Every structure is written in structure tokens, then in C-alpha cells.
A protein has these predicted regions:
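Short linear loop/turn motifs
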Residues: 400-409, 445-451
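Hydrophobic side chains in well-ordered alpha-helices
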Residues: 142-145, 389, 433, 479-483
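Cytosolic Rossmann-like ligand/nucleotide-binding regulatory domains
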Residues: 428-478, 482
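Short peripheral tails and domain-boundary helices/loops at the edges of structured domains
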Residues: 488-491
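A general boundary/transition motif marking the beginning of the first structured unit of a protein
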Residues: 377, 422, 471-472
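Structured loop/turn residues at secondary-structure junctions
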Residues: 37, 344, 426, 474-475
Length: 491
């Protein structure tokens, strides 16, 4: 007697595919790093190998399923991108990052669409959709490359801020074009749509992010493992509320992550570790599914058009966006060259390419195949070219790998928190010696982090603006509020 559920074969196939991907990835990690090829491409290749056009072990032709899974995966990838966006990155690159994430995506999409329409025999809608879906860079691919690419702080910060925040604009352009195809839209409706998407998403993300921060600051959860799960739930809440009112759920999710990452000092190590793993799992699963969905035998037919699109995208559209959005901000031609090459593509364009498939748009299969090919080629070329370009321009600048985080010590019976305090100009502790400061009872400054260097504090150590104080304090619900009030001279 045997009982088998319909989901059992799917679980078995999924487990075999995922484990194969992980172990093969581990075996080729050194070579992939040597040749600067993002590991995500391996998961795409494995999906293609196991799919209908390969070994035919797993059959997947449900674009709507892949799209829905892709949206969920992007939710967690963007949430993790927001959580890991450092306040120092925002300070260094907020303006150019915001410009590249908005106007830059539009410039990239517009120029690419114009090139597609001029060089390929397609209609304006198809050209516009191809431009829109390849308009953004991929956070996972960019972060992967930057881990082993020695870039100056400002350049690295700009790439991080841009890649973590530009997906919502590409989504908005794609959805807007499809809505225009289905319903027709005037220029005024486009402006209204964009405003609701961006402003509404920003408001929802800001509100949910602050709600998460206030709630978790005032609530001591029973288990440390509940903190990252709660943050994930707040991210899903932000997305759901935003799309319910017609705003951008992706803008809301990213902003929620930014606020939580910047303002919630408690349990940051466990929160970031959990969400990094969750985002990696989402990325692996997403690339495997996308590889299963594509038919490799159809790619040679679109090779020439896709190469033309890639050329326009990497040689014209991306540089034009970078140079336009960094004018008057002190960026030299070497930095702009590196920024142009560093705009790697990844899963987001392929997920967006499933939108025309599910909408039944004319030329949807062509769009998907072209975009898939463009992502493969652009990641290979840019991934391989980035480090030699950085070295050739004499632009190498190694950054310290250590980054401070606040952490509640997870040792049984030890009620201690290590609190991270960023010193700003409005704080009364700025410009004063440590011996002059009456720190609250039960707390002690154990380290000062300045320009990524750790200073062991003494009585004559001067506290400066932009320092990060690591303070050991007895764990209680009011410790963070008392330390903040102390730093601002309010108590």
C-alpha cells in the first residue's frame, strides 16, 4: 500500500535540481571567479539543461507561474537590497544614484527601444517593451561582481544604490506599456500613472518601514529568529498595501528595507544573514525556473538581433545614461567608464519579459528570447571586462572587508547588546572627548569605527561626525532610546 501526493514528484525534481546547482556551483566557483562570470549564469544553464530542450527531465511552459514566482523572488531580493544599503552609501551617492535609478533607466530604455525600432523589423510596442525590460541593472549580479572588484568607495556606492533601487522603474515602464497596449493611454494618464506608482510606493514604503522600526524597537520578541521573519512579513505587507492602492510594490519594499536597515540597530546580524540567504535562495530558484522556461534551440534564430540590441544597450544607451545623470557632480571620465561597464543585467529583465507572454502581446516570444540572449551576452561581456578595465584605468582601490553591525549577543544567560551608534553633526557628543561624556549607567563605549578603521577608545579619544560608536549595554527595552537621548544631549 502506497500513498503519493501529486506534489511529491515536483519536490523530488526540485530538490535534485537545486542540489545539483549548488554542488556544481561550488565545484566551479574558482573558475567562475577567475573569469569574472556571475554564478547566476550557471543556474540558468542548468535550468536549460534539465528543461524540454535539454535532458527533458523537467517540463515547464507556464509563463504565468514563473512570473508569479519571479515577483515573489524579486520582493525578497529588493528587500535584502534595501536592508544592505548602507547610510554611508546613500550619503556618498544619493543624488546620482536616484537619478540613475529613475531618469537613467528611462534614458537607457528609450535609446535601446529606438535602436531596436531602427535596426529590427518590429513595431513600436515591441521595441518599447524590449527597451523597458532591459533598462535596469541587477542588484545580485552587481553585488557579486563588486565583492572581488576593487573599486573606489564613491563608485562602488553609486553602483550599489543604483542597482538596488532601479528595478521599480523598469517594472513601471513595462506594466505601463502593456496597459497602453490593452487600454490605450494619453500622456496625462502616463504622468498620473508614474506619479501614483512612485509617490504612492514611497509613502507606503516609508510608513511600513517606520512602523516596522517602531514596533521592533518597542517589542522584545521571544526568539531571536523571529526578528528576520517579522521583517520579511513587513516587506510583504508593504508590497501588498502598495499594489492594492495601485502604487509600486517594489518601490515600497525597497524603501521599507532601507529604513529598517538604517534605523533598526537591534539584531542586525541575524536579520541581514537571514535575508542574504533568502535572497540567494530566491535568486537561485528564479534562475533555474527561467532556464527551464526558455528553449535554447530558439536562441540562434534571435542571435543577430539580440547582438544588435546588446551593442546599442552597452555601447550607447548605458553610457549615455551614466554621463547624463552624473553631469556636474565631479565624476571623471574614468569613473563614468567603469560605471558604464558595471551596469550588469540579470534576472529582472528576464522576469519582466514574461509579462508580455502572460498578456498575450504580439511578438511576446520574440521579446522573451531576445531579452534572454541579451542578458546572457551582456553579463558575459561586462562581467569579464570590468576588472581589466578597472586595472587598465589605474582605478583599483581595495576597501576594508569589515563592516560594523549592532548585535545582541546570542549567548545563553548573557543579557547584553552591542549597539551601533552613528554620530551626526546634531549630536552633542560630536567634537567632545570620551572622558567628558557621562554615558548612561550599564553602558560602555568599546570601539570607535572611523573611515572603516577600528579605534580602541581611551579617555582622550575625540568623537567626530560620521564616527560609529560600538557600545556594550545591558539588554532592556529602553537602552536604545536612552543611548540616543544621551548622544543628542536630551538626557
Amino acid at each position: 500500500m502506497q500513498v503519493t501526493l501529486s506534489v511529491d514528484p515536483l519536490l523530488l525534481a526540485g530538490a535534485v535540481l537545486a542540489l545539483t546547482a549548488v554542488f556544481v556551483s561550488a565545484l566551479v566557483t574558482r573558475r567562475s571567479r577567475r573569469f569574472r562570470v556571475p554564478g547566476a549564469l550557471l543556474f540558468l544553464a542548468l535550468g536549460m539543461l534539465f528543461g524540454d530542450d535539454g535532458l527533458n527531465l523537467i517540463s515547464l511552459d507556464d509563463a504565468e507561474l514563473v512570473q508569479n514566482v519571479g515577483v515573489i523572488a524579486l520582493l525578497f531580493i529588493l528587500l535584502e537590497g534595501g536592508l544592505t544599503t548602507k547610510p554611508t552609501d546613500l550619503k556618498l551617492a544619493a543624488l546620482p544614484g536616484l537619478l540613475l535609478a529613475t531618469i537613467g533607466v528611462m534614458i537607457t530604455a528609450g535609446i535601446t527601444a529606438a535602436g531596436v525600432w531602427l535596426f529590427l523589423d518590429v513595431d513600436l510596442l515591441t521595441a518599447g517593451l524590449i527597451g523597458a525590460v532591459v533598462g535596469s541593472t541587477d542588484a545580485a549580479a552587481v553585488f557579486s561582481m563588486m565583492r572581488t572588484t576593487p573599486l573606489p568607495r564613491r563608485t562602488a556606492a553609486l553602483l550599489r544604490v543604483e542597482s538596488g533601487s532601479n528595478d521599480p522603474i523598469a517594472v513601471m515602464l513595462t506594466v505601463g506599456l502593456l496597459a497602453t497596449y490593452d487600454q490605450g493611454a494619453t500622456a496625462g494618464q502616463w504622468v498620473s500613472f508614474a506619479a501614483i506608482q512612485l509617490i504612492g510606493g514611497g509613502i507606503v514604503g516609508g510608513a511600513v518601514g517606520m512602523l516596522a522600526v517602531v514596533t521592533l524597537r518597542r517589542t522584545a520578541l521571544a526568539l531571536e529568529g523571529l526578528y528576520p521573519i517579522t521583517i520579511a512579513a513587513f516587506g510583504a505587507l508593504a508590497y501588498g498595501l502598495a499594489v492594492t492602492i495601485g502604487a509600486s510594490g517594489f518601490v515600497a519594499v525597497y524603501l521599507t528595507g532601507v529604513l529598517v536597515g538604517a534605523l533598526l540597530p537591534r539584531q542586525r546580524r541575524s536579520i541581514l544573514g537571514f535575508h542574504e540567504a533568502l535572497a540567494n535562495a530566491a535568486e537561485i530558484g528564479l534562475f533555474l525556473l527561467l532556464g527551464l522556461l526558455v528553449f535554447p534551440s530558439q536562441l540562434p534564430a534571435v542571435a543577430l538581433p539580440a547582438l544588435l540590441v546588446t551593442a546599442v544597450l552597452t555601447l550607447v544607451a548605458r553610457p549615455a545614461a551614466v554621463w547624463s545623470c552624473t553631469l556636474g557632480q565631479g565624476y571623471r571620465w574614468r569613473e563614468r567608464t567603469v560605471l558604464s561597464i558595471g551596469g550588469l543585467k540579470g534576472a529582472v529583465p528576464i522576469v519582466l519579459a514574461t509579462f508580455p507572454l502572460t498578456a498575450g502581446t504580439t511578438g511576446a516570444n520574440l521579446i522573451f528570447d531576445v531579452v534572454f540572449f541579451v542578458v546572457l551576452v551582456s553579463v558575459l561581456i561586462q562581467g569579464i571586462a570590468l576588472l581589466p578595465t578597472v586595472k587598465g584605468l589605474g582605478f583599483e582601490q581595495h576597501q576594508p572587508a569589515w563592516a560594523p553591525v549592532a548585535e545582541a549577543l546570542p549567548l545563553e544567560g548573557i543579557e547584553i547588546d552591542i549597539v551601533e551608534l552613528h554620530v551626526t553633526a546634531d549630536m552633542t557628543v560630536a567634537g567632545r572627548r570620551l572622558s567628558e561624556l557621562a554615558i548612561p549607567d550599564g553602558s560602555i563605549v568599546t570601539a570607535v569605527v572611523r573611515n572603516d578603521e577600528v579605534i580602541v577608545p581611551k579617555g582622550d579619544t575625540e568623537i567626530r561626525v560620521d564616527d560609529v560608536l560600538l557600545i556594550t549595554t545591558q539588554r532592556d527595552r529602553t537602552a536604545l532610546q536612552r543611548l540616543t537621548a544621551w548622544a543628542r544631549g536630551e538626557g
